[in-house]
Amino acid sequence: MLFAPPNLETKELFWIIYILILIPKVFAKVMSVRELFPFFKWGFNIRRSNFLVPILSNNVIVTGEEAVQYEKPLPYIPQHNQQQQQKQQPSQDYIQQPQNDNNINSGKEQEQQQQQQQQQQQTPDITNQPTKTNKKIPIKELSNEEILIKLEKGEVLAYRLENELGDCSRAVEIRRMLLEKQLSKKIEPIPHEGFDFAKVQGQCCENVIGYVPIPVGTAGPIQLNGQLVTIPMATTEGCLVASTHRGCKAITESGGAKCTITSRGMTRAPVVRFSDIVKASEFVSWINDTDNYQALKAVFDSTSRFARLSAIKCTIAGRSVYIRFKCDTGDAMGMNMVSKGVEAVLEHLKIIFDDMTLLSISGNMCTDKKPSSINWTEGRGRSVVCEAMITGDVVQRVLKTNVQALVDLNIAKNLIGSAMAGSIGGFNAHASNIVTAIFLATGQDCAQNVESSNCITQMEACNDGQDLYITVTMPSIEVGTVGGGTSLPAQSACLDIIGVKGSSSSKPGANADQLAKTIASAVMAGELSLMSALSAGHLMKSHLQYNRAKTN
C-alpha cells in the first residue's frame, strides 16, 4: 500500500489516490477515460510519451478543464501509425506541466495541431484511391436454395446454369428443384444420378433434368457377310427383340445374309432466288458445266478432312433454284459437315452471281426427317441391299409357316397394300420398328428414322418352291459412328457390341457402312419373323404372351 509524504498538498494527494483507482479499471476495460468526465471538473486528455511507458501504457494524463474536448471522439492511432510518428518526430523524454496561462494556451494549440495531423493521417485520401464497388458473388459460391431464388426472380437463366456453375450435375439438380416447385410435383422417378452430364452439355440436350432409361436387349447373333454380329436394340415394345432374334436364327441357320452398300452420300439442298427465270436458267447451266463443278468441288472439299463432294443437282421452280449437294462424310452421319461445305460454296457463288439471294440453307429438297420420293428414288446417307436364302426346313421348323404362304402374303400386304395406300418407301411390314430400336441403342438421330426406314421387302419361292429367297432394299439409311449421341457411354458401348465404335482407322466410312449393313440385316430378320407370324396367325398370340403386363 502507498502512503503520501507529509509535505503533499490535499489536491495532489487526491490525484494520486484517484489515479490508483482509475488505472486498474481502464486497463481492465471496465470504463474508458472519457466516461470519467462527469466525475471531476478538469478531465483529461491523452498525449503520447516515452517517459511513463511502464506506468500508464505510454500515456500521461494532463489535467485542466481546457484540455478536455468533450463530445468529440478521441483519436484512434493504429500501432503502425504510432511507429511512423515516432520515426518522424523526436520522442519526448519529459513533458513539463504548464506553469502559467500563456504556456497552457500554447500547449493547447500544439495539442490541437497534433490531433489535426493525426486525423489527416487516419482519414484516407479518396481522391487518390479507386472507388470501391460491391463485388458480385459468383453464382457457384451460393447455395442451391439461394440460386433457386435467383432463378425465380429471373436474375439467373435456367439454361445457363451449366456455364454459370461449371458443374453439370449440380445444374441438373437445381433445375429439378425449380421444376418441382413450378409444377408442385415430384419428379423423383426421372433419374439423374450416375450419369456424366458433361458429355451432354453443348452436344445432345439443353435444360437437362435427368435421363430416361430404356430397356436394351440383343438379337442374334446373325451371320452377316461371313461374320457373326450381335444386334443391340432399345425398345419398350415387348416381343420386338424376341421376334427379331427368331429371324436372325432362321437366317444364320440357313447360311447367313449378304449385304452391300450401293451408294453413299449425305445431302443438303439450299434454295436461292434470282431476279427472273432467265438468270435462274443461266445459273443452272453454269453449275452443270464440268469445269465449274470441279471448281466448286475444290471449295467444298477444302472445308473438311473427310467431306468430299460427289454430285450437285439443280431443280428450278419459277425464279428459285434448289441446289442439292451430295457428299461423302466418312464415319459421321454428316449433316453439320455437309452444311459447312455448302455455306462455303454459296459464298463463292455469291461473288460470281451478285444477284443471287439465299433464302435458306435448307430448301426441303434434301430431304431431312420428312417423307419424300427423292430420298426413295435417289437415296440419302447409305443405300443398302441385303439378301438371304432360307431353307424350307428352317421355314417350317423355326418360323412355323411355309414358303408359299410367305410369298403370297408379301405380295398382298407389302406390295399391293402399300401401293393402294399411296405409300412412299413403305413397302414393308415394320422396318421402322427395328431401325428405331437400333437408332436409340447406338445414339443415332431418331428423327431420321423417317427416311432411314424407307424399305421394300421382296420374297420369292426358289428351288422348285422348296426354299425362300428374301431381300430388303433400303436406299436412305442415315447413320454415323462418331458425333452426336454416339459419344454417350451407353450408346458407345452398344456400338462396340456391333464392332463399329468410333471412326475406322483403316478406311474412313467403313464403320458407318457396317452399321448400315447391320441395320438392314436386322430389318430383314424382323420382316421374316413378323411375316411368318402373320401368315401362321400367331401374331396376336405372341403379343398377348410378350407384350402385355399381367395387370392388363
Curated annotation (Swiss-Prot):
Keywords: Cholesterol biosynthesis, Cholesterol metabolism, Endoplasmic reticulum, Glycoprotein, Lipid biosynthesis, Lipid metabolism, Membrane, NADP, Oxidoreductase, Steroid biosynthesis, Steroid metabolism, Sterol biosynthesis, Sterol metabolism. Belongs to the HMG-CoA reductase family. The keyword Metal-binding does not apply. Pfam families: HMG-CoA_red. Residues 79-99, 112-122 have a biased composition (Low complexity). The keyword Heme does not apply. Its EC number is 1.1.1.34. GO terms for molecular function: hydroxymethylglutaryl-CoA reductase (NADPH) activity. Residues 123-132 have a biased composition (Polar residues). Gene3D superfamilies: 3-hydroxy-3-methylglutaryl-coenzyme A Reductase, Chain A, domain 2, HMGR, N-terminal domain, Hydroxymethylglutaryl-CoA reductase, class I/II, NAD/NADP-binding domain. This is 3-hydroxy-3-methylglutaryl-coenzyme A reductase 1. The active site is at E237, K369, D445, H543. This transmembrane glycoprotein is involved in the control of cholesterol biosynthesis. It is the rate-limiting enzyme of the sterol biosynthesis. It comes from Dictyostelium discoideum (Social amoeba). One of its GO terms (cellular component) is endoplasmic reticulum membrane. It is found in: Endoplasmic reticulum membrane.
